[in-house]
Amino acid sequence: MSPNSTADSDEKKYVLAIDQGTTSSRAILFNHDGGIVAVDQKEHEQIFPRAGWVEHNANEIWDNVRSVVGGVLAKAQINRHEIASVGITNQRESAVVWDKNTGEPVYNVIVWQDTRTQKICDRLAGDDGPNKYKDRVGLGLATYFAGPKVTWILENVEGARERAEAGDLLMGTMDTWTLWNLTGGVNGGVHATDVTNASRTMLMNIDTLDWNPEICADMGIPVSMLPEIRPSSGVFGYGRKNGLLVDTPISGILGDQQAASFGQACFEKGQAKNTYGTGCFMLMNTGTTPVRSENGLLTTVCYQIGDEPAVYALEGSIAVAGSLVQWLRDNLGIIADSKDIEALAASVEDNGGAYFVPAFSGLFAPHWRPDARGALVGLTRYVNKAHIARAVEESTAYQTREVLEAMNRDAAASGSTGAALTELKVDGGMTRDELLMQFQADQVGVPVVRPKVAETTALGAAYAAGIAVGFWSGTQDVIDNWAEDKRWEPAMDEAERERLFRNWNKAVQRTLDWVDEDVVE
C-alpha cells in the first residue's frame, strides 16, 4: 500500500495519544473501547540551573517523543495504517521559544514550576496588583503561566528580542512544540495550539478565545510569535513525510488536567474530577459561560469540540498531596514505602486530635498564602505515629473539600444553577488508597468514583482526536466507554464531619503569617 492510499475505515483500529509530561514523554495506544493496547515511556532530564529555576531540553523531549511513538508501534506490532488519529496532551504552562528557520530553541523550556519570573510579574502588576488581567484572561499574575516565561527569554537571551521582532522566532507550550515537529518542523510544520493550553498563557481573552494584543504588548511579546488558537478536537495537521506517522491526522490537543477531565467524561455542568498526584488538581465543568472566581480559583477552558461553543471550568490546585506521603517516608522515616501509609493509618480509629497542614511552600487554592508554612497541631502524649499517618491522609481530603466548597460558592454566586457537585470523579495514584477515598467521600458529602481506566489524561487526548475523525461519534461514546471501578458513599455522621473540618480550619489559621518578608529562609 502506498503512503498516500486511503485505508479502509475498518482497518483503523486504534488512536494514539502522546502524553508529554513534566518528567517523561509517553505514547499510549487505545482501542475503540477506550482500553489500553500498548504503552512506551521515556524520562527526560530535569535541569536546575539555580534555586527556583526548572528547565527541560526541548530537543531531548522531541527525540523522546519520536522514540516512544516508535516504541509503542513496535510493542503493539502495528503500523500507522491502523491508527485513525493522534492526540497530544501535555504539561501545561511550560514554554519554549525557537527559530522557525532552523527549528532550534533559543533557550531551554522554562517549566511551569519555575519561579524566575516573579520580578516580571511584580513589574506587570504595578499598582494594579496581581489580578490586573484576571477579568480578561481568568488568571492572576503568577510565575506558573507561560506569558512571563517568554518575556524572560526575550529579555535575557542575547539577540532574542531582535530576532522575535524580525519575525524569526516562534513560541509555544509543549503541545505546540510537539505538533510543529510532528507535522514537519521547518518543512511546513503547523504552528498552532488549542484553547485549553492557550488559556494557561495569560495572553488569551477568556471570553473571545483570541490573543489579547494589549497584554502581549505589556509583556513585550510580538504577536507574530504566537501560535494559532484552535478547538481541542479538530484536525491540526498530518504527520510529516519522513516520520513514523506520515499522513496520519493529529486531531486532538488538551492540556493535561483538561484531558483528564475529558477522559473522565465530565461533560455536564457541575461535574468535577480530582487528580491525586504530587499535588491535586480539581476541575469543575461550568458550562459554556466562563465563571469568574471570587474564591481563589482559576477560570480556564475545559475543552472545545470543533465548531461547538467552548466549555469552561473552574480549577483549584493543591500544592501538596502525594508529596506529603513521600515526605513522611523520606524525611521522617515513619513508613518504609508509600503504600504502607494506608495500613498504618487504618490501625487507629481516628486522628487522635492531630491535624497536619502541609504548607511546605505556602498554601495554594483557595487561600493563596505564600507566607504559610507546614504545621502539625493538636498534639498530646496520646498521639502516635499511626495518628500522624492518619492526619497526613486526612489533609488531602480536607484540602479537596476546601476547593470544592469554593467551587460551589462561585457557581452559586454566578447564578449557574445546576453547577453544584453531585459526585466527584477521581484519578491518580492515591486513589488506590481506600481509607483516603472513603474519608474523601465523608468530607465532601457526595460519592467519590474511580474509573476502570486509570490513564485518564492520555485517554482524554485520544478521545478528542478520535472524535475529530469520526473514530468515535462524539462525547456519548466517551460516556458509554467510561466504566466505574469503585464508588465510595459518604458514611460519616454530619456533626462529626463538621467538627473535624472546623478543627482543620483552626489548624490552617495556625500556619499563616509564618514567613516575614524581611527574613530570608
What positions do the PLM features span?
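Active-site core segments that coordinate phosphate-bearing ligands/cofactors
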Residues: S2-D10, L16-I18, Q118, A125-G140, ...
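Short secondary-structure junction motifs
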Residues: S24, R80-I83, S224, N351, ...
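Carbohydrate-associated surface elements
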Residues: D114
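A structural motif corresponding to the C-terminal end of an alpha-helix
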Residues: D218-M225
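Short linear loop/turn motifs
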Residues: L226-V235, E342-A346
